[in-house]
Amino acid sequence: MVWSPVLLGIVVLSVFSGPSRADRAMPKLADWKLCADEECSHPISMAVALQDYVAPDCRFLTIYRGQVVYVFSKLKGRGRLFWGGSVQGGYYGDLAARLGYFPSSIVREDLTLKPGKIDMKTDQWDFYCQ
């Protein structure tokens, strides 16, 4: 098959046209968050899910009752009902953990690992979907 320059150009542009529809900034849930460190990389606490929660979009985590959740941030202001964290991806830990938000009301904090004392401004990457 012979590729014409126009057809080849269309294929190249469609492949390298930028982020896909799944890669996008989503609306911010809050302007501020509480973290344990300045990178928000250390978990504040460990919590246990009291009920199932199905993520409404890619910013959120789907969590099942009984799962251990690592809390990395607590949103402030208008988003104060949501915390940021991760759960292990598979039953035996064979899948990578994913970060996302969930309602604070569905978990019970069982262990404080490092108190959340640092107020951080959120940015677009805090609510970016991939």
Swiss-Prot record:
Residues in the signal sequence: 1-22
Organism for this UniProt entry: Mus musculus
GO CC, any one term: extracellular region
Gene transcribed to yield this protein: Mia
Domain SH3 stretches: 42-112
Post-translational modification: May possess two intramolecular disulfide bonds.
Highest classification ranks of the organism: Eukaryota, Metazoa, Chordata, Craniata, Vertebrata
The protein's role, per its UniProt record: Elicits growth inhibition on melanoma cells in vitro as well as some other neuroectodermal tumors, including gliomas.
Compartment(s) of residence: Secreted
Keyword Signal recorded: yes
InterPro entries assigned to the protein according to its UniProt record, in alphabetical order: MIA (IPR043369), SH3-like_dom_sf (IPR036028), SH3_domain (IPR001452)
Name this protein carries in UniProt: Melanoma-derived growth regulatory protein
Biological processes, Gene Ontology terms: cell-matrix adhesion; extracellular matrix organization
Keywords, alphabetical: Disulfide bond, Growth factor, Secreted, SH3 domain, Signal
